Amino acid sequence: MYLAILALPMFGSAVAGLRGRTIGVTGAHIITTGCLMTSAALSIVAFYEVGLSGSPVSIVIGSWIDSEFMLVQWGFLFDSLTVSMLLPVLIVSSLVHLYSISYMAGDPHNQRFFSYLSMFTFFMLVLVAGDNYFIMFVGWEGIGISSYLLINFWYTRMQANKAGMKALTVNRVGDMFLSVGFFAIFWVFGNVDYASVFSVAPYINETAITIIGLLLLVGAMAKSANIPLHTWLPDAMEGPTPVSALIHAATLVTAGVYLMLRSSPIIEYGPTVLVVITWVGALTAFFAATTGLLQNDLKRVIAYSTCSQMGYLFMAVGLSQYNVALFHLVNHAFFKALLFLAAGAVIHGMADQQDLRRLGGLVNFLPFTYTAILIGSLSLMALPFMTGFYSKDLILEVALGQYEVSGTIAYWLGTISAVFTAFYSFRLVSLTFFTTPNAPKGDYLHAHEAPMIIVIPLVILSIMSIVFGYIAKDMFVGVGTDFLSTALFQHPDHITLIEAEFGLPLLMKLLPAIGSLFGAGLALYLYHVVPSITISLTNGPIGYGVYSFLNAKWYWDALYNGLIIESGLRIGLVISKVIDRGIIELTGPYGLSTVLTGAGRSVATYDTGVITSYALYIMLGLVSLIFLVFAPTNMVFNEYGLSLILVYLSALVLLPSSTRTS
């Protein structure tokens, strides 16, 4: 059963990709979606057996690398962390497959699209279920390639090409550090198997742990879009909307967080690493929340909310609250998938329009889609008793419960980010559904709700966005729960959940919720009641400066393009001119041909046609040969040998000039 969870998505991908013309579009839909739904059902059974019944499963298929100093096996581990990740990955992926049947109905390359989707899911399952870091790396690289194929699915569009290459290139930076980190683990621990590495982690030098932790962190930052390696994430919106839902909800961006969670027995012994992770997460949450305030693309607003939520997850990891991070990861998968799929329903129903400034007044035309986006936005802003509330607010509480500088700063940055998150979430709702209609009249005349095959995933995700947090809270983060005790490690000094639950002032616990309600109300007031205020705010120099800074996304793209890319191109030009076309050309092909041509002409001058010259050459050759053959070894380079060489050279020089030039 456990191997079937992994094998079924790959089987569906292979059949749809290799036999797509034989089975047709409908066949590709049935096979890939059926395989994913079967895997999702089996993952629920696995969650019950492994997670709830406490029966971890380890499966070894065979040996991969077997040498004197390294043994890497094709092994898979199903513990409570693995099955907890399988739930959002497979449930969201199966719903995305079902949703895509209608959403991609008009595309001529359905078989290829569904093959890529299933392959993406398969590699994510390999990453999650592998029992060593090398198997994880196979899945890690697999989802990277799959994301490129999906983002660049419409490869005739220049922006899609650029977005795909950008995602692949930025992630390649993280992959380089990650691969070095994995080999550092092998060098320090002598193994890459989880059980072997984690068992000796407490006895390893702290400096080595810190270096390994930072290397793993850079890899996770690229994959989970934390600053400064976040720039690929908004551009990934060039792919089809189902791809956005799959990448941003349950697969690609969660891989980096999963790496940190799985490596908790290592990074727990590196306090410097934990502080750096906390700061990276807090700054990412704040940056993405401020940048999302001014985005006008429907999908990009949700993309920046994903980036912000990844910051919250990293913040929880840096605070050593791994169970809280996992809980928010699962919650986030459901309400973020709901937001993206509902946004796709808006785009689908409004003639592919996704500019917020060209929408408005859709609440009467798309009431069900409005309800779905409203539920997702309320869960994202952590409205009390929605799914997001039970994990997002808890992250801020445990940050304040640390009673450390990094934790306190993380709390305040996270709280401010929560206000901004609520603001841009309801800015999206207001501009899309409440404001004056701004789209062409024909778009409204043809506006329509999504068909039933799209409605079903939205209904399921809406229910999960409302009730899942309440149902799973005690299991994941309840006081005294041992659900994740065998999969995650938390040092006793870092346990602050009790303090966060019972020791903090009530005002500090309610402040994020109050701020979120204020941000949501402010957005509705500014964009629905008095929209003219938003224009006047940018008239002054300060307002215009802030607007320009946030609208330029903190100038990260300009920094990379101007400082790194342009400098690299200039250095490449200099290298090309000075070395490749300069030194190498002179000493290489051009210089070698010149030297050989000159040497050939010099040798040709000795072809004089004079018999006495030839006799001299023959005599010198014979004398030299006799000397080299019969002379003792120690005499070759003594005074006799040198004398013979001088005689030989003198004979060449003293030849009559007429003989040498005739």
Swiss-Prot record:
It is found in: Mitochondrion inner membrane. GO terms for molecular function: NADH dehydrogenase (ubiquinone) activity. One of its GO terms (cellular component) is mitochondrial inner membrane. It comes from the Eukaryota. GO terms for biological process: ATP synthesis coupled electron transport; electron transport coupled proton transport. The chain crosses the membrane at residues 40-62, 77-99, 112-129, 133-155, 168-190, 200-222, 243-262, 272-294, 301-320, 325-347, 360-382, 408-430, 450-472, 510-529, 609-631, 636-658. Its EC number is 7.1.1.2. It is an enzyme of class 7 (translocase). InterPro entries: NADH_DH_su5_C (IPR010934), NADHpl_OxRdtase_5_subgr (IPR018393), ND/Mrp_TM (IPR001750), NU5C-like (IPR003945), Proton_antipo_N (IPR001516). Gene3D superfamilies: 1.20.5.2700. Its main location: mitochondrion. Keywords: Electron transport, Membrane, Mitochondrion, Mitochondrion inner membrane, NAD, Respiratory chain, Translocase, Transmembrane, Transmembrane helix, Transport, Ubiquinone. It catalyses: a ubiquinone + NADH + 5 H(+)(in) = a ubiquinol + NAD(+) + 4 H(+)(out). It is a multi-pass membrane protein. Belongs to the complex I subunit 5 family. Core subunit of the mitochondrial membrane respiratory chain NADH dehydrogenase (Complex I) that is believed to belong to the minimal assembly required for catalysis. Complex I functions in the transfer of electrons from NADH to the respiratory chain. The immediate electron acceptor for the enzyme is believed to be ubiquinone. This is NADH-ubiquinone oxidoreductase chain 5. The gene is ND5.
